[in-house]
Curated annotation (Swiss-Prot):
<protein>
    <recommendedName>
        <fullName>Krueppel-like factor 3</fullName>
    </recommendedName>
</protein>
<keyword id="KW-0832">Ubl conjugation</keyword>
<feature type="modified residue" description="Phosphoserine">
    <location>
        <position position="250"/>
    </location>
</feature>
<dbReference type="GO" id="GO:1901653">
    <property type="term" value="P:cellular response to peptide"/>
</dbReference>
<dbReference type="InterPro" id="IPR013087">
    <property type="entry name" value="Znf_C2H2_type"/>
</dbReference>
<feature type="modified residue" description="Phosphoserine">
    <location>
        <position position="108"/>
    </location>
</feature>
<feature type="compositionally biased region" description="Low complexity">
    <location>
        <begin position="70"/>
        <end position="81"/>
    </location>
</feature>
<feature type="cross-link" description="Glycyl lysine isopeptide (Lys-Gly) (interchain with G-Cter in SUMO2)">
    <location>
        <position position="196"/>
    </location>
</feature>
<feature type="cross-link" description="Glycyl lysine isopeptide (Lys-Gly) (interchain with G-Cter in SUMO2)">
    <location>
        <position position="198"/>
    </location>
</feature>
<comment type="similarity">
    <text>Belongs to the krueppel C2H2-type zinc-finger protein family.</text>
</comment>
<keyword id="KW-0539">Nucleus</keyword>
<dbReference type="GO" id="GO:0005654">
    <property type="term" value="C:nucleoplasm"/>
</dbReference>
<dbReference type="GO" id="GO:0003700">
    <property type="term" value="F:DNA-binding transcription factor activity"/>
</dbReference>
<dbReference type="GO" id="GO:0000785">
    <property type="term" value="C:chromatin"/>
</dbReference>
<feature type="modified residue" description="Phosphoserine">
    <location>
        <position position="224"/>
    </location>
</feature>
<dbReference type="GO" id="GO:0000978">
    <property type="term" value="F:RNA polymerase II cis-regulatory region sequence-specific DNA binding"/>
</dbReference>
<dbReference type="GO" id="GO:0006357">
    <property type="term" value="P:regulation of transcription by RNA polymerase II"/>
</dbReference>
């Protein structure tokens, strides 16, 4: 009985090859459902004898299918060691197998690092009798029959010899891919991007990123490349008070008087509020929209706060009182001057 490993092998395309055999041998193969056909014709002494050829035996062509890459020929033609090449369809009477048996694999040549193996096969008496008729003597055990494929099998599978190699290769690829996914560069860049600046109390840092469009060109290019590299290498910077005065056009100064500038010729006044700029423009135009409503008073003012202070003269209201004495004032600036006198005494 044939003993084979049921591990599947990879299927390859078949090409038809015609080989001639004796008619009596072909007739003995017809009743069998399964069979093995050799990719290369066996020696003539197996199937052709001088006696058979002299009696006029007719040779018939047989359509066979073999692999494109035929397996290497057998090592020797001795009767005791016989190796059959790649896949076939029909078999001799002694190699018939029942339909319930598992599919027999196709043998693929092992890799250079793997030792070849053989499957011992017991020679049934029917096959021994068939081979003895053609001049072959069998010792009872045929050492190795490498590839045997049964026709009803619809597809082939990969040999089990390649499976350990494929598994080890996939494991190595997984290990290599997992080691390549370590973000080494990002871990070093993140701490550098987070910079802390230590500032002494009483000094406000220059906010150059708030209003970069308002900075003058000399201030934008004031930092030289060596200083920029020094700042990159030393993220912690300590600003000492009193070492350098703030420039005239510093960002803080620009932020306080950045937009509201008088556009009259010869006037360079700048205001932080648009209402103050409007009141200043009235000094150029002479417009005084705020008129006193007190009866008999014709005073007009360009600013509303001026009208408010004027109206307190009519009412006598003095909301600003000194905390050190009982005096009161109608204007806040008058109260500030009075308190300075208390400090000087």
């Amino acid at each position: 009985m044939l003993m084979f490993d049921p591990v599947p092998v990879k299927q390859e395309a078949m090409d038809p090859v015609s080989v001639s055999y004796p008619s009596n041998y072909m007739e003995s193969m017809k009743p069998n459902k399964y069979g093995v056909i050799y990719s290369t014709p066996l020696p003539e002494k197996f199937f052709q004898t001088p006696e058979g050829l002299s009696h006029g035996i007719q040779m018939e062509p047989v359509d066979l299918t073999v692999n494109k890459r035929s397996s290497p020929p057998s090592a020797g033609n001795s009767p005791s060691s016989l190796k059959f090449p790649s896949s076939h369809r029909r078999a001799s009477p002694g190699l018939s197998m029942p339909s319930s048996s598992p599919p027999i694999k196709k043998y693929s040549p092992p890799s250079p690092g793997v030792q070849p193996f053989g499957v011992p096969l017991s020679m049934p008496p029917v096959m021994a009798a068939a081979l003895s008729r053609h001049g072959i003597r069998s010792p009872g055990i045929l050492p190795v029959i490498q590839p045997v494929v049964v026709q009803p099998v619809p597809f082939m599978y990969t040999s089990h010899l390649q499976q350990p190699l494929m598994v080890s290769l996939s494991e190595e690829m997984e290990n290599s891919s997992s080691s390549m996914q370590v973000p080494v560069i990002e871990s070093y860049e993140k701490p550098i991007s987070q910079k802390k600046i230590k500032i002494e109390p009483g000094i406000e840092p220059q906010r150059t990123d708030y209003y970069p469009e308002e900075m003058s060109p000399p201030l934008m290019n004031s930092v030289s490349p060596p200083q920029a590299l020094l700042q990159e290498n030393h993220p912690s910077v300590i600003v000492q008070p009193g070492k350098r005065p703030l420039p005239v056009e510093s960002p803080d100064t620009q932020r306080k008087r950045r937009i509201h500038r008088c556009d009259y010729d010869g006037c360079n006044k700048v205001y932080t509020k648009s209402s103050h700029l409007k009141a200043h423009r009235r000094t150029h135009t002479g417009e005084k929209p705020y008129k006193c409503t007190w009866e008999g008073c014709t005073w007009k003012f360009a600013r509303s706060d001026e009208l408010t202070r004027h109206f307190r003269k009519h009412t006598g209201i003095k909301p600003f009182q000194c905390p050190d004495c009982d005096r009161s004032f109608s204007r806040s600036d008058h109260l500030a001057l009075h308190r300075k006198r208390h400090m000087l005494v």
